[in-house]
Each structure stands twice: as structure tokens, then as C-alpha cells.
Amino acid sequence: RVLAAKECTNIYAPLANRLGIGQLKWELEDYCFRYLHPTEYKRIAKLLHERRLDREHYIEEFVGHLRAEMKAEGVKAEVYGRPKHIYSIWRKMQKKNLAFDELFDVRAVRIVAESLQDCYAALGIVHTHYRHLPDEFDDYVANPKPNGYQSIHTVVLGPGGKTVEIQIRTKQMHEDAELGVAAHWKYKEGAAAGGARSGHEDRIAWLRKLIAWQEE
């Protein structure tokens, strides 16, 4: 399993990243981390579990306030909390030499807007109601990542001075971020697929079989 995890780290996770398939990339990274660093994996998983209820209650209130403000301003967007992946938490702890409690993005929210205009309107609402940390702001909509990833990232100080990481993107950007190149296969094959299983789903299933094969 350790050998398989190393192969996933060196081959499949980078491949998923290059293809822009965020969902698969996160699954692979957590799988690899679980076997390559079992002690750290269990420690972070335990911390996340211990504080889950407090974190969920905090995010629920935070999201409720944002939804109300956006509705009042006529901004069309979905707002919800999003799970954090154990490997990404550990990597940020290592990179920035931070303790678990110091991380910005253990509390995380995503805003999926109807249009690009709604994206920036949502950003304006967020920054109007909460003080943001300028060093943690990135506009990958105006400046996409090399793999095509687009989102606005910002970190704000929520109630009680607790940091909250927020991603803002359109529905199209969200699908691209989750499925990568497979999203484009979906667009091309959607009309022909009808009610049947689409080609992009087959391709995603094939990529996931790589993980299952490595686990055997």
C-alpha cells in the first residue's frame, strides 16, 4: 500500500491536477497521505472530528448571514460550507509552519454565482461586512492557474475574530474545477448522451478505477 501511495503521489495526483480534476486530485492526495504519513493523518482527522460540531454551527450562522445579504442586494448565488481535505490541511501547516488552530481555511465557505458579475458583487458584499486579509487574497478568475482553474479566494475575519476562507466562482467555473477536462467532454457529449450514462462519467469512472487498482 505504501508503494501504491507513492505512485499515486508521483503520478496520478499530479495527472489529475494537470487535467484540472479537483475532485479526483483531493481523493488521491488524501489516499496517499493516509498511508505515507499515517500518524499525521490520524492526528488531523481526530482534530477535525473533535471540533466538527462547533465548526459546523459557526459556518451555518456565517452562511446564513451571507445568504441574507446577497438576497437583499439581488445577487444570485448559492452559499454553503465546504469540507476541507486532510492532506491540504497538513500541507498548509507544513508550508506556513502553522499549528492546526492557526490555519485560515479549516472553516471554509464556497459561493457559486450565476454570473461573473454576481461573483464580484458577492466579493464586494463579503469584503463590506467582514475585514479581509490582503495577503490571502487571490483572483484566479482574472489570472487563471496554468491548468485553467478559476476562482476568487479570500480570507476574512468572521464573528469572534475567527478566520474563514471563501471561494467565489460561477457555476461553469465550479464544474470545470471539479471535473476539469472531463467537463468539456460532458459539454460535447451531453446532447448525444440523452438519458444514458455520458462519456465523461465513463472517463471519470476509469480514472477512479486507477485508485481501486492500486489499493488491491
Question: What are the roles of these predicted feature ranges?
Answer:
Residues R1-E216:
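Nucleic-acid processing machinery
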